[in-house]
Structures are given as C-alpha cells and as structure tokens.
Amino acid sequence: LGERDLQLGWAKAGLIVGHSHQGDHGRSVSLDTQADRHYIQLDRKNFKLDSLHFHQQSEHTVEGKPYPMELHLVHRDPQSGNLAVMGIFVDEDKSDPHTPDEPLDKFLDQIAGGGSDADVTLDPAVFIPSRPDQFYRYEGSLTTPNYDSNVSWLVMRDPLKVDSEQMTKMKA
C-alpha cells in the first residue's frame, strides 16, 4: 500500500489527554480524542484514535523475527464500530541516545511514575515510524479480550527505535 491509502490525521493534531492503567494484559492508555483531529483514514473511512497499549514481546513477526515490544494504536470507526489497529514494533537502539526532554520521554515518565493508574498527555506523532507509508496489512481480529473481529491490521515495517532507559519505562 502507498501513502495515499493511509492518512494519519493525528500526525499534526497535537497533545491528547488520556488515562493510563496497568491491567492483566499490560499497560493500556485510553484517550480522550476528537474525531475530527485524531484519526487515520483508511479506504476512505475515518477511524478515530481510541486507545493504545504495549505488548512485551511483539505479537507479530517479520520473517520469523520477533521484537522486544509492540505498540498498538487502536482506532475505531464511529459509525460501524470496526477497528483499525496500527502495530508498531519497538526495538532498542544502542547507538542513538535520546535527550531527556523528548516528548516520548515525557510520556513514558508519566506512565512509569503513575503506578497502576495515571493521567497522561501525549502527542501520538512520537510513535510515527520513519516511513509510515511502509506497512503490512491484513484483516483479522483482536488478540486480547473481547477478541473483536472486523479488524484491519496495519503493521508498520520500520520499528520505533528507543534507548535502553525508554525500553525499561515501557516495560514497567
């Protein structure tokens, strides 16, 4: 698929307020988003950004290779209820230290320091891989309860690169 098939409406939408919760299936963040600003467009349909969560050990693999983590950005079509989930691999990059004031660090500090529950703000653009037009797509279902079907999966080809400190915070 090319860039024209997927548009990231939230790429320049700015900060989102949300609530982080540590549950049985890991860390999830529910988001208070606006349908006209925080969406992706796929197949000419808008899917509102609804939540995000992390999986330790990626659920997807590429040529048999798993990644240490996978981030899921869950989007919902407000009319049909169908989902579009953007899967982003997370990999540790030992050669690229990040500065402490990066937006990703601020977000990770909020979820790591908030215990099991925390209010957060984030700019979802921090998760955009270097080539967002390069992804694998398939139709499937959720891998966690309630196991909804009618899910369009978009698994980004390029991983989000983080340093070891950021990886530790994501796993907290």
Place the predicted regions along the sequence by residue:
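Alpha-carbonic anhydrase
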Residues: 1-172
